[in-house]
Amino acid sequence: MSNQLASLRDITTVVADTGDIDAIKKYQPVDATTNPSLLLKAAGLPQYASLIDDAVAWAKLQSNDAEQQLTDASDKLAVAIGKEISGTIPGRISTEVDARLSFDTAATIEKAERLVQLYEDAGIDKSRILIKIASTWEGIQAAEALEKKGIQCNLTLLFSFAQAQACAEAGVYLISPFVGRILDWYKKATGTESYAPDEDPGVVSVTKIYNYYKEHGYKTVVMGASFRNIGEIQALAGCDRLTISPALLEELANEPGDLEVKLKDNDATKTPGERLTESEFRWAMNEDAMATEKLSEGIRNFAADQEKLEATLREKLSA
């Protein structure tokens, strides 16, 4: 009998939201995504101990400056883990730019190019990499410039329609609109204990973005992310891609039956309007309390986990 994970694979590209190679081998996704939080978790796994040691040793050879060594070791480790993962999947690995650069377009471009170079030095072509960038105004501008250089991007921490519109207009390859974190905010703000999957605010948000992209002929890939339960995944079956944690992949694999296609790619019927200006984007974000709060929180959390990872590396660099 078919299970819901197998059924989902027939209608949506399944991506693993983890840095755990054993989980990736088990569920056989097409792509995989990482972020600073997942890298921090992965760095604690015994199978990655040698990668940390190698990154530290390599960084020491690149510079005598302690802070530069830390930056180099961090970048090298992210790429080393990405390379390991890329050997277990047919598709792409997403590696994230330091969240502390989220409001600096030039620095984001520089870091992205550095990560791509390290991947290419490790024998991984840039066609197999997506550079993850927070969906700030500055991040979206960086992504537009990188796309023109042939470096494809995954715009993350996306909570609002304005962010999605700006990404499409910038010609970004892929966006990761968050589902579960939107649900978290609404549950807390409204006191609502639970939502039916089709009424889940995160599901509603991704559905609106998906339909807008398809109606207007945008090529940007929509990859739903950050799920709290399989009901959200079931309600978005048919989305271009869904990036799912190992725990929820397991739940889907244990759920018998087929999934109904919920999102369908209808032919474009509308012409895109004027591009969002920076002031329009910032005003739309200001008017969206949920998106503003969750974007800021997401950047802070990723930055904090990056700093925890660096603390581990700093200790090893000084040993």
Curated annotation (Swiss-Prot):
InterPro entries: Aldolase_TIM, TAL/FSA, Transaldolase_1, Transaldolase_AS
Compartment(s): Cytoplasm
Name listed for the protein in its UniProt record: Transaldolase
Stated family: Belongs to the transaldolase family. Type 1 subfamily.
Keywords: Cytoplasm, Pentose shunt, Schiff base, Transferase
SUPFAM superfamilies documented for this protein: Aldolase (SSF51569)
Record field: catalytic activity: D-sedoheptulose 7-phosphate + D-glyceraldehyde 3-phosphate = D-erythrose 4-phosphate + beta-D-fructose 6-phosphate
Top-rank EC class of the record's enzyme: transferase
One GO process term, biological-process aspect: carbohydrate metabolic process
Species of provenance: Alteromonas mediterranea (strain DSM 17117 / CIP 110805 / LMG 28347 / Deep ecotype)
Pathway entry: Carbohydrate degradation; pentose phosphate pathway; D-glyceraldehyde 3-phosphate and beta-D-fructose 6-phosphate from D-ribose 5-phosphate and D-xylulose 5-phosphate (non-oxidative stage): step 2/3
Catalytic residues in the record: K132 (schiff-base intermediate with substrate)
